[in-house]
Amino acid sequence: MIDQDLIKSGSMHLKSMLASLSIDHNGLILIEDVFTDQIIEKLLKFCIAADDWEPQLTADNKTIVANRKKIAWRYDCIVEETHTILENVTPEICRLIKRDNLVLGGVNLWKDTEGYTIKPHTDNPVIQTSLQVYIQNLPTLSTIFDYDGNLVHTNPNTNAGYISDNLIGIPHWLPNAVPAEFNRYSLHAIWS
């Protein structure tokens, strides 16, 4: 069952956090304290309990991404609740990215398992904006961006991550592989 109070408090929390961010950036915004503690705890419990993770495919839908699984949509649970929260804050995302009429395309939960890593790449510009928030992570698993000639490390802590303007095409990667006996969980949202 959907928790409307959680959605309301989560939307207010995230709107407040986003309102505090500057629009003076070049397409990369590092974020912290994205969701309430209650939402992060609920996301982590959901990820740990889920047994129906699906293979993550590459952008061309032809190749399975090694050691990454996803959950793309679930009704009446934290997946739908976070989708609704992110839908509610889309005007703030538009303001930050300086683009009108972005539409939330969806929310994925990612489960990265032993050996997962990704080489330098840019995201598909069909997805204009993306957000990634770490639900469970390690200090060595920080996404690195090549941003204006500088290497920028995201904060790898739980409930931190980034918002990226994918039309700019900022190269990024995960240099260290997920170690044995650890699952890295994150939430990834896209707007077009």
List the model feature ranges, each with a label.
Residues 2-97:
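Non-heme Fe(II)/2-oxoglutarate
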Residues 38-41, 66, 103, 116-119, ...:
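Short catalytic/ligand-binding loop motif for oxyanion handling, primarily in non-cytosolic enzymes
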Residues 108-110, 176-177:
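Short, solvent-exposed loop/turn elements at beta->coil junctions and helix N-caps
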Residues 109-124:
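Conserved short histidine dyad/triad with adjacent acidic residue
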Residues 17, 105, 116-118, 150:
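Residue-level marker for the onset of beta-strands and adjacent loop->beta junctions
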Residues 125-127, 137-192:
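Catalytic core of Fe(II)/2-oxoglutarate
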Residues 97-108:
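A short coil-to-beta-strand element that immediately follows conserved catalytic motifs
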Residues 130-132:
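Eukaryotic charged/polar low-complexity linker/IDR segments
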